[in-house]
């Protein structure tokens, strides 16, 4: 039969500060499962309604394990539990016992007919605060239309992505990016990372600033875990979506799943074309000789991309599940560029020339993931997980750069570049969890990771008759890293207090080989990574946690490879094969406050890092070459506040603020690079819900200026806006978004010393996107996006 779900106004975390008591106050708890498959139902809606007015008094949604916990202050009430595609259950005549009502396990039955009318479905909060992490729910971010995963990260609290695609967490770039809790070929931290993952594919992003020993120790700043959508509703469900935008950003996406008693089959496919322009400007000045080189120009990254995910869950029985997932992505790149040079001597223009570049590349990526999970009879939290993951990324790139003189001395030059890059990674994991008792649990596991990378780089100069290999810029660089890890954690909870101790041991075997110089480097080392976390629940509205962990950030191939990037012959970047890993000791104290319409998370943190990797620029007349070195230590102390406030049913605000002070110590070639500085950033998002299912969202972001090892980065602010309109009775969604409304998001750096002056500026500009999506079966409309900034 057809069911019309009553319009819900769901207020998340309806809890009080607990400093006062009320005779009608009680806690409502329970667990929700599918009556047929006996699997948990996450994100089901639990509503407490006033018996007299029939209006919603309080509400929440079930978590990933189908559980819910809700504080209620009402005497005459009834409870409704609902989920799309299932019959709503109603509970009346409930009486609290010792200020608590336990509904135990609630089994929802599937509807025999498809829901045709859904007025309002309970929505997850945009940001959820937990003691050990923050969860950013992408579906609630209206401005995500037209975004890629990289742009989604830039909207996540504590995270910043600059216009070069570099991801930082609380100002530190040592970030480990995972997908569904695992490393992925789609999430490496190169400039092309996350390009084929789109906002439509993402359920949420978890920000973990102080991970336990269970997590890979990689990433001194912490962990960003991107959770992809994986539909598990019974029957056939799906969504299709279309996006278009300017600059060129066009994509189509399809998501399908079919769930039976034994199998859950799922697939996602996306394809599109996007154009990513960037304007650049540079000034290199030698104060001693009074010579100056000015350059300005543009570069485009035009991409055709495809991404296909196929997977299945096989429920062998109630306690054993086998999951197999495959992912294939392919990108075709075209990167035209042009730079205009002007060479001055004592303010007199002497030479002018242009450098035109044309780069073409293909990037195949594939990955497989096999998992087996066993739940033991005595407790469903008693589990064994075995997984094997393989991934491959390749890049075949050809470039040609042509210098054309327009004034002065002859600077004509014709160069070709050919790159063949291949990376293969293999990860094997075993994780065991045993809740020995209600208060005591243990975790143990191991992991073995192999990274095998090769980069064949060749530069050829035109001699007039033919192109001849330039040995100064040509090399074949090989990099192999093997990491074997073991970990164990134990946790104890009593009343309102909890303690978790952990230790991780990692043995690293890394080797590099530079073919053209026959230079080999190798290193084997073992590290211990302890972690300590403790928490105390002062009352239902206020909890605190403190934590300590030790982390590592190992140099990547592009950090180690000494090849020169010659796209701009006067601003060159190169790697250093002698780099050592960074080590960080991280301390943090966090409080989470939850009131009637306010949630607040505040943290004080301190980090100590040694062997800091820093890029140092070396000036030679008007040419700048920047290379990475290990420069001493860094101490960082900061405060971070994240909050959400919903003063009215139609108005909500989310904000975050991060400020820290840092102290750097280090020397290079007898030059002191020690300095101190401050940096802060803030973000505020306001969402307004209008009648007729129309939502509006505006986000303002500001990043302050700050000191670098050799100069100063300028501060900047930018704004994004978005509109969303539900149509076709909620099955369709129309989105419009404008990112960087005022074209003010820039990267601007100044290095000013006694002998040299360098200025660099780059900008992407405004992006506008329009998206439409439609859900069928029991699915909902989604907003597939194909863009990346």
Show the residue positions of the predicted features.
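Short acidic/polar hinge/loop motifs at secondary-structure boundaries
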Residues: 71, 149, 155, 182-209
């Amino acid at each position: 039969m057809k069911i019309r779900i009553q319009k819900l106004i769901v207020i998340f975390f309806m809890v009080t500060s607990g400093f006062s008591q009320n005779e009608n106050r009680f806690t409502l708890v329970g667990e929700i499962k599918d009556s047929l498959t006996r699997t948990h139902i996450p994100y089901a809606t639990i509503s407490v309604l006033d018996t007299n007015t029939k209006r919603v008094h309080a509400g929440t949604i079930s978590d990933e394990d189908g559980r819910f916990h809700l504080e209620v202050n009402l005497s005459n009430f009834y409870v409704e539990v609902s989920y799309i595609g299932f019959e709503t259950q109603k509970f009346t005549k409930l009486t609290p016992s010792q200020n608590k009502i336990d509904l135990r396990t609630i089994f929802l039955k599937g509807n025999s007919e498809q829901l045709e009318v859904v007025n309002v479905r309970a929505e997850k909060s945009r940001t959820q605060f937990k003691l050990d992490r923050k969860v950013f729910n992408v579906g609630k971010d209206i401005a995500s239309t037209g975004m890629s995963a990289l742009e989604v990260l830039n909207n996540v609290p504590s995270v910043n992505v600059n216009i070069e695609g570099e991801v930082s967490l609380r100002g530190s770039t040592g970030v480990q990016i995972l997908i569904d809790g695992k490393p992925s070929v789609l999430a490496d931290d190169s400039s092309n990372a996350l390009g084929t993952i789109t906002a439509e594919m993402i359920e949420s992003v978890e920000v973990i600033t102080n991970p336990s020993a269970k997590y890979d120790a990689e990433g001194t700043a912490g962990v960003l875990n991107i959770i992809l959508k994986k539909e598990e509703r019974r029957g056939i469900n799906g969504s299709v979506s279309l996006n278009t935008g300017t600059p060129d950003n066009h994509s189509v996406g399809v998501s399908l799943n079919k769930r039976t008693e034994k199998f859950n089959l799922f697939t996602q496919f996306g394809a599109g074309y996007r154009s990513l322009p960037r304007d650049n400007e540079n000034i290199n000045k030698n104060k001693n000789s009074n010579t100056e080189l000015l350059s300005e120009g543009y570069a485009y990254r035009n991409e055709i991309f495809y991404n296909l995910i196929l997977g299945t869950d096989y429920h062998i029985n109630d306690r054993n599940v086998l999951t197999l997932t495959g992912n294939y992505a392919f990108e075709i790149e075209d990167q035209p560029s042009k730079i205009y040079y002007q060479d001055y001597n004592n303010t007199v223009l002497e030479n002018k020339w242009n450098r035109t570049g044309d780069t073409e590349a293909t990037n195949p990526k594939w990955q497989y993931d096999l998992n087996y999970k066993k739940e033991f009879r005595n407790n469903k939290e008693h589990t064994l997980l075995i997984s094997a993951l393989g991934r491959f990324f390749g890049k075949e790139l050809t470039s040609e750069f042509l210098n054309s003189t327009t004034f002065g001395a002859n600077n004509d030059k014709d160069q070709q570049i050919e790159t063949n890059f291949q990376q293969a990674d293999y990860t094997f994991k075993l994780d065991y969890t045993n809740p020995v008792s209600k208060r005591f649990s243990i975790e143990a596991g191991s992991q073995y990771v192999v990274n095998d990378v090769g980069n064949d780089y060749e530069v050829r100069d035109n001699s007039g008759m033919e192109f001849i290999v330039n040995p100064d810029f040509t090399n074949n660089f090989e990099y192999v890293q093997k990491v074997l890890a073991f970990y164990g954690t134990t946790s104890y909870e009593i009343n309102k207090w909890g303690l978790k101790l952990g230790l991780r041991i990692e043995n690293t075997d890394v080797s590099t080989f530079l073919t053209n110089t026959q230079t080999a480097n190798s290193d084997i080392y073992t590290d211990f990574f302890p972690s300590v976390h403790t928490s105390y629940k002062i009352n239902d509205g206020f909890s605190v946690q403190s934590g300590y962990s030790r982390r590592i950030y190992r140099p990547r191939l592009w950090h180690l490879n000494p090849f020169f990037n010659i796209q701009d012959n006067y601003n060159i970047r190169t790697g250093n094969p002698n780099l050592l890993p960074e080590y960080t000791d991280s301390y943090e104290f966090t409080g989470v406050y939850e009131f009637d319409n306010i949630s607040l998370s505040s943290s004080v943190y301190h980090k100590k890092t040694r062997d800091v990797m820093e890029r140092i620029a070396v000036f030679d007349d008007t040419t700048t070459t920047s290379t990475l070195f290990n420069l001493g230590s860094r101490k960082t102390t900061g405060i971070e506040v994240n909050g959400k406030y919903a003063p009215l049913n139609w108005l909500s605000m989310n904000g975050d603020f991060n400020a820290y002070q840092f102290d750097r110590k280090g020397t290079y070639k007898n030059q002191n690079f020690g300095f101190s500085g401050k940096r802060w950033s803030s973000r505020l998002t306001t969402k307004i819900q209008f009648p007729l299912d129309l939502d509006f969202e505006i986000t303002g972001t500001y990043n302050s200026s700050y000191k670098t090892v050799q100069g100063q980065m300028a501060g900047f602010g930018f704004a994004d806006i978005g509109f969303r309109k539900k149509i076709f009775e909620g099955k369709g969604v129309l989105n419009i978004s404008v990112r960087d409304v005022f074209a003010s998001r820039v990267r601007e750096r100044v290095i000013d010393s006694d002998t040299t002056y360098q200025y660099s500026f780059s900008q992407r500009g405004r992006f506008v996107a329009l998206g439409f999506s439609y859900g069928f079966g029991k699915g909902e409309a989604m907003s597939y996006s194909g863009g990346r900034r």
